[in-house]
């Protein structure tokens, strides 16, 4: 999937080299397309210098268009909120948007940052409350918003140079909280949040993943309120979850996708004694 700044196209290039044009905009594209898959449906989003964020299907049908009032240089980033997918993106007039897959605004959005937004948004649950935050660097300020549009505590964070990348969010030092790593015009910046958080299942870096695919797939979960440590999905983290984890470790029992994710507290791909120690620590504290 590509966008062009000469012919103003969103195009699909097949593996045999043939190309299909999905949309012709009224001005050039300067950002990469982002793709979300839900069920069998694909939506491709790309912002143009015709002042619109365009969303089209894989067959070229216009899904929706958001008139931003200025050029769109940032690529869309996706988040799943209670089964509904939202796209976050900015425009050159300083507006940060959050829209559903019909183009409707998320409650509390857009937010007026006031300066041109060229970078894309990353997501993480910074404080471990089960609700993600949206993080974006604009000029020399790093912003973090709750999903209702309110600002996260201690943000924005100021820096002497302009931020030039989407945040990469990870627990770099394996201490249970998250670090925000952001490129700037003068250096690489790391900000320690110092609250227990999670990036699991979130678009937590530029273009979604290490391969920079810009692809997001909505995966149905058997648990309506997924939470690391809540292995039996009863909204509590307690001794019953420990027993299930120990049974899995000792007996090498099969787990569902959700149980495997919820049991792997340190997200190292292995369910072991370290995860048990982590859940005991959570319960005690």
Residue spans of the language-model regions?
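Extracytoplasmic/lumenal domain signature
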Residues: 1-222
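Cellulosome-associated attachment modules in secreted, modular CAZymes
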Residues: 220-285
């Amino acid at each position: 999937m590509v966008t062009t700044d000469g012919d103003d196209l969103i195009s699909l290039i097949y593996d045999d080299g043939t190309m299909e044009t999905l949309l012709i905009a009224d001005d050039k594209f300067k950002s990469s397309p982002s793709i979300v898959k839900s069920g069998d449906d694909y939506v491709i989003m790309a912002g143009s210098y015709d002042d619109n964020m365009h969303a089209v299907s894989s067959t070229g049908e216009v899904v929706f268009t958001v008139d931003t009032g200025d050029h769109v240089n940032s690529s869309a980033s996706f988040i799943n909120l209670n089964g509904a997918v939202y796209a976050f993106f900015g425009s050159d007039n300083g507006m940060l948007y959050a829209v559903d897959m019909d183009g409707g605004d998320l409650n509390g959005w857009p937010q007026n940052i006031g300066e041109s937004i060229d970078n894309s948004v990353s997501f993480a649950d910074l404080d471990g409350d089960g609700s993600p935050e949206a993080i974006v660097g604009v000029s020399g300020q790093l912003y973090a918003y709750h999903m209702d549009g309110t600002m996260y505590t201690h943000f924005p964070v100021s820096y002497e140079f302009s931020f030039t990348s989407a945040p990469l969010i990870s627990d770099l030092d394996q201490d249970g909280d998250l670090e925000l790593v952001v490129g700037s015009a003068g250096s690489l910046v790391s900000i320690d949040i110092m609250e227990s958080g999670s990036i699991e299942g979130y678009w937590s870096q530029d273009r979604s993943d290490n391969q920079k695919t810009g692809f997001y797939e909505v995966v149905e979960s058997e648990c309506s309120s997924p939470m690391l440590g809540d292995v039996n999905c009863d909204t509590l983290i307690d001794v019953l979850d420990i027993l299930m984890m120990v049974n899995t470790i000792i007996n090498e029992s099969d787990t569902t996708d959700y149980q495997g994710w919820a049991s792997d507290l340190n997200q190292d791909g292995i369910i072991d004694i370290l995860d048990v120690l982590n859940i005991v620590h959570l319960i005690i504290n």
